[in-house]
Amino acid sequence: MRELYIKNLCIEITRRCNMRCTHCMRGDAESVDIPLKHISNLLRHVRHIHHFNITGGEPSLNVRAIRHILERVRAYGITVNDFYIVTNGSATSRSEEFIEACAALYEYQEEKEQDSGHMLEMSDDRFHDPAEYAATLAALSPYPFFGVRGQAERIFLFREGRSTEGFPNPVHGIYLTEENYVYGDLCLNAEGMVLSNG
């Protein structure tokens, strides 16, 4: 059965991170990468994804999973309107393998111009290293899929993990229509659990 149309899909590909940001909603990094079989098991039921968010931890630490996602959406013929990844701007986000994987995602997605931002965005806030920021900005700026998240002044945070400020993380319902359209934010976490929020 490959009938699902998903409005918002988020896959947490890793819980590893190379920073310890005080605002991190994920909490302490864990040495956990999503088993690739969980990605395949979910995507084999999907026909169309409007917005596909690849998250972590730091996504650039698990390029293998990003490549697997691209391989599966191609193999299953899944239409993806747009992908979205946020990086912390560390050295791994400047790696050739990460940039190549992002370029391949960008080529695959249907929409090249996104109203809400770019396919790959770097956090631009008071929590990240300015030296890393400058080096990553220089390395990634030439790519059409890259942009800065643009929230240096105001950051919307949930009060979870190490974050001591912000709002409670809301839990939203997931709804499946008779036409197999999934409404809501569907999230596959690194442990293989399907959740209604990230």
Where are the regions a protein language model picked out?
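Hydrophobic transmembrane helix bundles of membrane-integrated enzymes that assemble
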Residues: 23, 138-144
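Accessory C-terminal segments flanking Radical SAM cores
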Residues: 163-198
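Acidic (Asp/Glu)-rich catalytic clusters
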Residues: 42-47, 72-77, 100-115, 137-140
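A generic structural motif
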Residues: 82-85, 117-120, 144-170
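Active-site beta-loop-alpha junctions enriched in small/polar residues
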Residues: 57-59, 88-90, 125-127, 151-161
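Conserved alpha-helical substructure of the radical SAM core
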Residues: 1-87, 92-97
